[in-house]
A protein has these predicted regions:
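Mid/C-terminal beta-alpha module of Rossmann-like enzyme folds, strongest
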Residues: 226-291, 324-326, 334-336
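Conserved beta-loop-beta element that borders a ligand/cofactor-binding pocket
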Residues: 155-180
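Glycine-rich NAD(P)-binding loop of the Rossmann-fold in SDR/ketoreductase-type enzymes
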Residues: 94-105, 140, 144, 148-151, ...
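NAD(P)H-binding glycine-rich loop region in Rossmannoid oxidoreductase-like domains
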Residues: 56-98
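Substrate-positioning beta->alpha
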Residues: 182-188, 202-227, 239-240
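Conserved Rossmann-fold NAD(P)-dependent oxidoreductase catalytic core, especially the SDR/UDP-sugar
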Residues: 105-145, 165, 170
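Amphipathic terminal alpha-helices
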Residues: 311, 315-336
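N-terminal Rossmann NAD(P)H-binding glycine-rich loop of SDR-like oxidoreductase domains
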Residues: 3-23
Length: 336
């Protein structure tokens, strides 16, 4: 089996590649991305796994046509994880340029070479902001360029799927993905809690859908294995999608409690009114990642439920606390 991972040296791509190499009898995994793997970012165990002779790197820009020679040896699965996603951080057109052109080029390439299976990671962003719980049956109403571009990219992949009855498509909408080497919001939360700098911004009970990166890799495999089952395919025969999150979505306080317990952080956590922090973010916008949009995201719930997984009695393996413990065990420097 030969697998191409677009966005292969990114956070999700690197962890999925490791999962494939350790759990599947694959002949080759090709990491396709704009830059090679930044080994300093990841745990030694992941870096060592990706040094497997079955794993190789191919530099390319997914906004351009994918060359034919990438298909030499055949392609059994294409995983499309490539995206511009940091929000804020880019102009509106940049999300659409990368996320739509990338989807177009991946689907055109799959059509050209005869690959029958695509795995695509979307996002919960297409659902848009709401105080209400939503799941796979809810209407997406994206409110940001990123969310809109991801929803449009889903439709492009669905258009590819309609091109043949033997095609298989799995679309996964993850919440916040965290774990070893993430370097994002949860990593910052760990760092601030360790230093005693973390404060609640009136958001103690705000729920944030999220998933451990290793859980996400297991979900990919679980879903791909079931695409031949008509009862599993909730879009049409051969195509399915689901939300990827813990059930129920953890609150900010749940994240804090799990991190403090695993990290053995004893410093107290205080609560500061959001209006005060929001005003300060305008004064110091752009310094150290401070931005009013990010401040608003901290107090805005994303109650996206994994109802599809729950209905099928999916085994998450890790809960929030055990995920944090596994992360600390694998990459303790993220916690030091």
């Amino acid at each position: 089996m030969r697998i191409l991972i677009f966005g292969g040296t990114g956070f999700v791509g690197a962890h999925y590649a490791r999962h494939l190499l350790e759990a599947r009898p694959v002949a080759q995994v090709v990491l396709c991305d704009k830059a090679p793997l930044d080994e300093s970012r990841y745990a030694p165990v992941l870096v060592q796994a990706l040094r497997d002779p079955r794993c190789s790197f191919r530099q390319l820009d997914l906004r351009q046509r994918i060359p034919d020679d990438l298909a030499e040896g055949g392609v059994d699965l294409i995983a499309n994880f490539a995206a511009v996603h940091r929000e804020p951080g880019h102009e509106a057109w940049e999300y659409f340029e990368t996320n739509l052109l990338g989807a177009d080029n991946v689907c055109e390439f799959a059509d050209r070479i005869g690959c029958k299976t695509i795995l695509f990671t979307s996002s919960i962003s297409p659902y848009g902001p709401s105080e209400l719980e939503r799941d796979e049956k809810s209407l997406p109403v994206p409110s940001t360029p990123y969310g809109a571009s991801k929803l449009a990219a889903e439709k492009i992949h669905l258009g590819w799927h309609r091109g043949g009855d033997d095609r298989r498509l799995l679309i996964v909408r993850p919440g916040v993905v965290f774990g070893p080497g993430e370097g994002g919001n949860v990593t910052r939360m760990i760092r601030f809690l360790r230093k005693g700098l973390f404060v609640y911004l009136g958001n103690r009970g705000v729920r944030k859908s999220g998933i451990y990166v290793k859980s996400l890799s297991r979900m990919f495999e679980w879903g791909l294995e079931r695409l031949g089952d008509p009862s599993f395919c909730n879009i049409r025969p051969g195509a399915a999608f689901f939300n990827a999150s813990f059930d129920p979505p953890p609150s900010v306080e749940d994240y804090v409690k799990a991190i403090r317990e695993v990290g053995e952080f004893k410093r107290p956590v205080f609560n500061i009114p959001f209006k005060l922090i929001y005003a300060i973010s305008h004064l110091f916008m752009g310094i150290g990642g401070i931005h009013p949009v990010r401040m608003r995201k901290l107090v805005r719930p994303n109650l996206i439920l994994p109802s599809f997984l729950k209905h099928l009695d999916y085994d998450w393996k890790w809960d929030l606390r055990s995920a944090m413990a596994d992360w600390k065990c694998e990459k303790p420097e993220d916690w030091a």
